[in-house]
């Protein structure tokens, strides 16, 4: 059986290095969703339909709500209205096998059923009310402290007090 891929984000907060987040992607249970995220970490698919690189590098976490989650992945508009998957625009909810069990869970942000693109969130708490609505496709395996530091610049509205940017990203294994 193939091992699940591991990818990383090297984060900056307010222009200063904040450390690395390493995530395991559940290719075993959500292969399509995991592959989308993996390829967006490496940037290997080139330019998307919207004329922007299909790559998380340089994009921000535009919505951070303490005691809830940190959301990013909108590399086209940067504000939560955009994003694009490697499959075109949006793709289906693959399954809801994995649950939002606690801090470090990686899940797809969406605008309703079957509207997955490139936006994702990392939970900072158990968020079981999202089970069956958002596809869980990975987990943080190193750098949860970095997620906690990002959480500190969030607010109840989701606006961050300092820019939170994926300065670099890619695949480890």
UniProtKB/Swiss-Prot annotation:
Manganese as UniProt keyword: no
Pfam families the record matches: Pro_isomerase (PF00160)
GO molecular function, one term: peptidyl-prolyl cis-trans isomerase activity
GO cellular component terms attached to this protein's record: chloroplast; cytosol; Golgi apparatus; mitochondrion; plasma membrane; plasmodesma
Domain of life: Eukaryota
A GO BP annotation: response to abscisic acid
Entries under CDD domains matching the protein: cyclophilin_ABH_like
Disrupted-gene phenotype: Increased susceptibility to P.syringae infection.
Task performed by this protein: PPIases accelerate the folding of proteins. It catalyzes the cis-trans isomerization of proline imidic peptide bonds in oligopeptides. Involved in reactive oxygen species production in response to pathogen infection.
Name the record gives this protein: Peptidyl-prolyl cis-trans isomerase CYP19-1
Source species: Arabidopsis thaliana
Phylogenetic classification of the source organism: Eukaryota, Viridiplantae, Streptophyta, Embryophyta, Tracheophyta
């Amino acid at each position: 059986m193939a091992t699940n891929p591991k990818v990383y984000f090297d984060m900056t907060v307010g222009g200063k290095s904040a450390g690395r987040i390493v995530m395991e992607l559940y290719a075993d249970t959500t292969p399509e969703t995991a592959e989308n995220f993996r390829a967006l970490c490496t940037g290997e698919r080139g330019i998307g339909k919207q004329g922007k690189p299909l790559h998380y590098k340089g994009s921000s976490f535009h919505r951070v709500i303490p005691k809830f989650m940190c959301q990013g992945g909108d590399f086209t508009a940067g504000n939560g209205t955009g994003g694009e998957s490697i499959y075109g625009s949006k793709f289906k909810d693959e399954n809801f096998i994995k649950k939002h069990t606690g801090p470090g869970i990686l899940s797809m942000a969406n605008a309703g059923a079957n509207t997955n693109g490139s936006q994702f969130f990392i939970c900072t708490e158990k968020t079981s009310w999202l089970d069956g609505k958002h596809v869980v496709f990975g987990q943080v395996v190193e750098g949860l402290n970095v997620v906690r530091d990002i959480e500190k610049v969030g607010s109840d509205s989701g606006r961050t007090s300092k820019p939170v940017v994926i300065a670099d990203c890619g695949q480890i294994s």
